[in-house]
From Swiss-Prot:
The gene is miaA. Pfam families: IPPT. Its EC number is 2.5.1.75. Substrate binds at residues 18-23. Residues 41-44 are annotated as: Interaction with substrate tRNA. Gene3D superfamilies: 1.10.20.140, P-loop containing nucleotide triphosphate hydrolases (3.40.50.300). The keyword S-adenosyl-L-methionine does not apply. This is tRNA dimethylallyltransferase. ATP binds at residues 16-23. The record marks 107, 130 as: Interaction with substrate tRNA.
Amino acid sequence: MIENKLQQAEVVAIVGPTASGKTALSIELAKKYNGEIINGDSMQVYKGLDIGTAKITEEEMEGVPHHLLSFLEPTASFSVADYQKLVREKIADIQARHKLPIIVGGSGLYVQAVLFDFQFTDEKVDEAARQAYYDELAKLGPEAMHDKLKQLDPQTAEAIHPNNTRRVIRALEMLELSGVSKAAEAQNRGEVPLYNHLILGLGQNMSREVLYDRINRRVDLMMENGLLEEVQGLWQQNIRGVQSIQAIGYKELYDYLDGKCSLEGAIDSLKQNSRRYAKRQLTYFRNKMDVHFVMTGEQL
């Protein structure tokens, strides 16, 4: 049944939390179904964010073409709307060459925005309101700002990690400007599929203990492979207050480099935040997406 769906699909997406086995499955399917892989991770678009985002290496690609990796400077902003436009263009290009586009990543909203009729309007910006929120953040801290959003828009707050202060503040800003919550604005979007697609999911059938152990071991391996040095390179360039360094792995080690915590404390936070994010990802995939979950390592 799954093989028939794969053969009929115009586009395949593979979603799953970190350390769930997406890379191995994507390479297997690309080889079997004449596919090319499109990055579906919102942070792997940045140059220099390689180890912390678990970006695939040339060796791991095994000759399979990969697209939309490492094409933006760390200081650049990149929205879901930007991603949607680029990926739809890339899908058309891959299909024109009679190959199968395979989107791979953990950013569920980004994948949905491509596959369904999500429409994005030009968002208003009020610099004074934004600065006021950042001033409030400096005084009260991330948790207090997230609690404020939770009181006003619990649905949106649930989807945003408290440490992702850029998104928390943007959600508060949208509420102030329009009076409409981000969640409510999105409710009537994204219901009509634009492609005959199949979304495969990993991690759902893995026990929480196994997944968390894989995540902890992956963090240890990242540190062995030079994650601290990678983050230090960004920190020394004084890259701050931008989207890229909100990624898990970067903000925790920035705290260490800023002298706010020990290295051990930063690594513990990195592991904890990675586990929490994996839990939120799985909840999102289950509740917000029509995902066909498969076993990690299952032959398709």
